[in-house]
Each structure stands twice: as C-alpha cells, then as structure tokens.
C-alpha cells in the first residue's frame, strides 16, 4: 500500500477532486500530491498523516497550495469521551459560526497552526 495513490492514479481523479488521508502517511505519494495541488488538478487535500511525522518546518508539503494539515488527531473515536467531546466542539463551533461569533480552536495562520 506504499504510494497506492501515486501520480498515475491522481491523474485519473477528476479535475477539481479532493484527497483526504487519515489512514497511513505512506499511502500517498506526497511529491505527486504536491504537484497535483500546485498544478490545480486537485482542488485540495487534507492530511492527518504524513511521512515523516512530525513534519519538518521546511518540508515542501507545508508550502503546497490548498492543503490542510492536521496533527494526527483523527484517531480513536471509539473512546466515548473523545467522540462526545469532538461532537460537542463541532456543534458549538457550528452554532458560533452561524451566529457570527468566534469559534473554538481556530488556526492562527500567522503562526502556522
């Protein structure tokens, strides 16, 4: 499964597709992903897993267009309190967004996280 989503397979995706990986960092050819994002073939991507982890500050993924990186937090939703807390935060943020109020845990783009 290493690089199962490679340049050839990304080319088969429709223009404007999105790629999401919450499984294994090795499943995606990251160089091919960067090229597909930068060329505009892919509209965006979200990665919760990357190679290496943690991702170095100067890694090319950090400069890729339309890429959302999360810090490997998509795991173990089977723990009751984790699931409940995530749902609670999502609902609160949805209500806050709809009402024009500040949301919890926003990314500070100036800081990069």
Identify the function of each model-found stretch.
Residues 1-60:
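Rossmann-like adenosine-cofactor binding region
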Residues 51-113:
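C-terminal helix-to-coil terminal segments
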